[in-house]
């Protein structure tokens, strides 16, 4: 469904807490932007309306020629990261325009996308929350094993998607319907209520919520 989307790239700085009406609220601090518009796509030319946002300083010598030419066409200095957001109001943007945290007033609902912390190879108890086998009474050195993964003759195979040990974390993940607690326009900071994916310093994308609750921000 077509809708207007506001977005900004930033870095996760960490978590802290603030007071709101005598209640302690846990928040994540995001160093958001400023981003710059590197391209505007239109329905007539590209078949869809979208805006490209670029973020993060980078040495121009490290940018490959095709990407460098893309930025030069927009008369914008090369950036380290780029993202494209589909939005019906893309025509209101122009190449070189700066996007800041002022796009996100306090109280608005947002979706935050990032890459989760990589945990490496993990067993089924840590990866999937299995309770493990009994601590005693017949269990011998198999306390953290997953147990049976299938029958011998029926079905005679392991079903696809069976939860097992394996690499955990390090995947793209979106947390929906978080509330912007406060905005610091001078320092380009967003205080988002709750936790967001990734370690400190991780790249995150903050955009207006796709499933915002009716009647205002999510509680």
Swiss-Prot record:
Pfam families: Ribosomal_L3
Organism whose genome encodes this protein: Salinispora tropica (strain ATCC BAA-916 / DSM 44818 / JCM 13857 / NBRC 105044 / CNB-440)
GO cellular component: cytosolic large ribosomal subunit
InterPro entries (alphabetical): Ribosomal_uL3, Ribosomal_uL3_bac/org-type, Ribosomal_uL3_CS, Transl_B-barrel_sf
Species classification: Bacteria, Bacillati, Actinomycetota, Actinomycetes, Micromonosporales
Name of the protein: Large ribosomal subunit protein uL3
Keywords on record: Ribonucleoprotein, Ribosomal protein, RNA-binding, rRNA-binding
Gene3D superfamilies attached to this UniProt entry: 3.30.160.810, Translation factors (2.40.30.10)
UniProt key word RNA-binding: yes
Assembly description: Part of the 50S ribosomal subunit. Forms a cluster with proteins L14 and L19.
Main function: One of the primary rRNA binding proteins, it binds directly near the 3'-end of the 23S rRNA, where it nucleates assembly of the 50S subunit.
Family the UniProt entry places it in: Belongs to the universal ribosomal protein uL3 family.
GO BP annotation list: translation
Domain of life: Bacteria
């Amino acid at each position: 469904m077509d809708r207007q989307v506001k977005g900004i790239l930033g870095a996760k700085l960490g978590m802290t807490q603030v007071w709101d009406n005598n209640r302690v609220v846990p928040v994540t601090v995001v160093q958001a932007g400023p981003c710059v518009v590197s391209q505007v796509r239109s329905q007539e030319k590209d078949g869809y309306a979208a805006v490209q946002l670029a973020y993060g300083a980078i040495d121009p010598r490290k940018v490959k020629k095709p990407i460098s030419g893309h930025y030069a066409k927009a008369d914008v200095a090369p950036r380290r990261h780029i993202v494209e957001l589909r939005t019906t109001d893309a025509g209101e943007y122009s190449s070189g325009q700066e996007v800041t945290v002022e796009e996100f007033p306090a109280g608005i609902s947002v979706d935050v996308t990032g890459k989760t912390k990589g945990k490496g190879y993990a067993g089924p108890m840590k990866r999937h929350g299995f309770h493990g086998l009994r601590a005693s009474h017949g269990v011998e050195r198999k306390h953290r094993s997953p147990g049976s993964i299938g029958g011998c003759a029926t079905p005679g195979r392991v079903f696809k998607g069976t939860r097992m040990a394996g690499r955990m974390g390090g995947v793209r993940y979106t947390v929906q319907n978080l509330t912007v607690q406060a905005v610091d326009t001078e320092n380009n900071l967003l205080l988002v209520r709750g936790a967001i994916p990734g370690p400190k310093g991780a790249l995150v994308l903050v955009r207006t919520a796709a499933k915002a609750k009716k009647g205002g921000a999510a509680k």
